[in-house]
Amino acid sequence: AVSPVQELHLQSNIAAGRAIRFSDGDSRGTYPMGLTCCLADQYSDIRFPDTLYAQKLDGDSCWRWIGIYWNWYWTHRYLDDVQNKKAEEPKPLEQSGMCILQDAQWCILRGAKQTAVIAKGGNNGESHNHNDVGSFQYLADGEAFLDDLGAGEYTKDYFSEKRYEIFCNRGESHNIPIIGDVDQKAGKEYCADRFELTKDRNILISFAKAYGIEAQKVYREIWLDENTGKLTVCDYIQCRPGVEVHENLVTRLPVSVENDSVVIRGEKHCAILHAEGRKGEFKIKTVEHLNHQGILENINVIRWDVCCDEPQNSKIGIADSKICLHITE
C-alpha cells in the first residue's frame, strides 16, 4: 500500500525546481533531500528531483537544528544503503501521468514539454489560507505561465482582520473567475462541493459555495493534452441576471496582447492564450506585490469580461467561457 506521505512526495515535485504549493507555500522552493532519502530507504518507487534544487545546509533561514540534522543523517544513511545494496539507486522524476490527492483536493496532470497543470478545490478556511478555491497553475519546462504567488511578506496586518485586503491572499490574485465584482469569501464553509479526476484526464470542480450568494453554480473543467501540453479550461457559471462575470489569470512573466490573443513570454517558451465567450478587449493590469522576502514583484493580471446570456423570463444569467493555452518554442 502507498502511504499518504509517499504519495504526496511522489506527486508534488514537478520539474526544474518547481513543486506543488498553494496558500502560503512557494512553488519555487527547494526540496528536502534528507526526507527524500528517508522515503527512498523505505519505498522502491520514490523519485528524486534534480539535485540542483535540493535544499542546501543554509537553506533554512531560521537555522532550525533538528531539520538540518535529519537532512544530513537520512541522506548519509541512504547513500550507505545504496552502496551496500540495501536500497535502490535514485530514479528521476516521471514526466507524464496524472494523480489526484483527494483529501487535499489537489490534482496534477503532466504532459509533453514538461508541462503540468495543478488544480485545487478545498475550502477558504485552510491553514495559512488564501481565497483560492478552484484555482490552478500551468507550468512548462520549469516556468509558471499561470502562477500561484505563495506567501506575501509576513507583517502584523498579514495575520489580522486585514489579511484579505492584501493582494496575494485575495481571490483576484489567483486563477479564478471574478463574479459580481466581489472576492471569494474566507471561511471553511466557502468551499468546493465537487472535485474529481475522470479517466479522460479531465479535472472537474464545482465551487459556487466559495463565492457565497452571488453565484448559483460555478463549474470548471480542466484538461491537459498529454501529447502536446495544450491546456483547455472551460467555465460554466449561473448567477443572478445583471451580474458581471470576468475571467482572471495571473503571471509573473511579461504579457502582451497580439492578434486577438494574449502572449505570455517565458525564458524558454511562450504561451499563447485564446479565449472563447469573451466580451470586449483583454485588460492587462500590473499589480505590485511584496513577496515573502519583502522584495517587490510586478504581477501581471490578465482579465476579460465574459458574455452572459439571460434567457427570456428567466431569473438567472448564464456565462460560458473557454480558455486555451499552448506552448511555443
Positions of predicted regions on the chain:
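Short, glycine/acidic-enriched loop or turn micro-motifs at the edges of active sites
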Residues: 123, 151, 238
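CBM-like, beta-strand-rich accessory domains located in the C-terminal region of large
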Residues: 24-25, 32-37, 49-69, 154-329
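Catalytic Cys-His active-site segments of thiol-dependent hydrolases/isopeptidases
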Residues: 146-150
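Carbohydrate-active enzyme catalytic cores, enriched for enzymes
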Residues: 1-145, 198
